[in-house]
Regions:
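Vicinal oxygen chelate
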Residues: 5-13, 31, 58-121
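Conserved beta-strand positions that form and line the central face of beta-propeller blades
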Residues: 7, 40, 52, 92, ...
Length: 121
């Protein structure tokens, strides 16, 4: 059976800003749950992993930067959207032989994420 990833969370100084950033780029649906100090994120699609964005309630060090890859059909178009929304491209495009290619970017708070385009079969 394995151990599939079933959820993700981003710790953020400004959850509303970060949620808006990802919603604009990927069309993710974000539901603000103020009673939980939490934003539930639905990524859509079959087999997608949903998650949440939260502002830590306690001061101190936050957990380490989390990196996950988001499947897209056009790396160049998403790079353009990321820049327009205030993000920065860190790795333009890199091939993974026999598998596909990826881009690494940071959101407005400097959190690194990846875009993934699988090789056409």
């Amino acid at each position: 059976m394995g151990n599939p990833v079933v959820h993700w969370e981003l710790m953020s100084k400004d959850p509303a800003k970060v949620a808006d950033f990802y919603a604009k780029i990927f069309g993710w649906k974000v539901q603000h749950r103020p009673e939980m100090n939490y934003r539930i994120v639905e990524t859509g699609g079959n087999g997608g992993i949903n998650g949440g964005i939260v502002k830590p309630e306690q001061a101190g060090p936050w957990p380490g930067n989390m990196l996950f890859y988001i499947a897209v059909d056009d790396l160049a178009a998403y790079r353009k959207n990321i820049i327009a929304a205030g993000g920065k491209i860190k790795i333009e495009e890199q091939k993974v032989p026999g598998m596909g290619k990826f881009t690494l970017f940071t959101d407005p708070e400097g959190r690194m994420m990846g875009l993934w385009k699988a090789k056409q079969k």
